[in-house]
């Protein structure tokens, strides 16, 4: 929903080998109507372009925007304690999908849930100073701030921790 709550999840199989395009479209149409969907987030991984093409070939009963969103870190989040606490009744695939979708709404609030250490930075990942990485992330969160309406305690706790460290160091 508009606050990032998971109301429903369902799998569709529009691509080979299942090729259930008609069934997938019918399920999507039903969900778009029932939940007043305004946007669809597609993770930028496997079959993302095929999925985007599939969605754009169909006309839904209401206008729906389609976005391809970075999946980076979604698998890290989906297996984390934070994700298990947020969605204890769902498996990692559903948790990851929710994380990707929420990135459309409030990317900072969603990405701050991901521990930056395991996120690869290509062939140079072992050259990255983890202390500097955490400090840089904290500075980014601090510079961006947060909205009063930000849902979830993770970003609020992180900002509070930054504030307390600053207050302890500087009075």
Tell me the role of every PLM-derived stretch.
Residues 23-38, 57:
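Short, basic/hydrophobic alpha-helical segments
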Residues 36-47, 66-67:
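Short glycine-rich phosphate-binding loop at a beta-alpha junction
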Residues 9-22:
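Glycine-rich phosphate-binding "P-loop"
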Residues 21-25, 48-55, 66, 94-105, ...:
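Amphipathic alpha-helical transducer elements in NTP-driven molecular machines
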Residues 2-3, 11-12, 45, 69-74, ...:
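Short, ordered loop/turn segments at secondary-structure junctions
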Residues 85-171:
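Long, highly charged, low-complexity intrinsically disordered interaction regions
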Residues 1-7, 104:
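Gly/Thr-rich phosphate-binding beta-strand-loop-beta motif of the actin/hexokinase/Hsp70
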Residues 16-18, 65-106:
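Short alpha-helix plus adjacent loop in nuclease-associated cores
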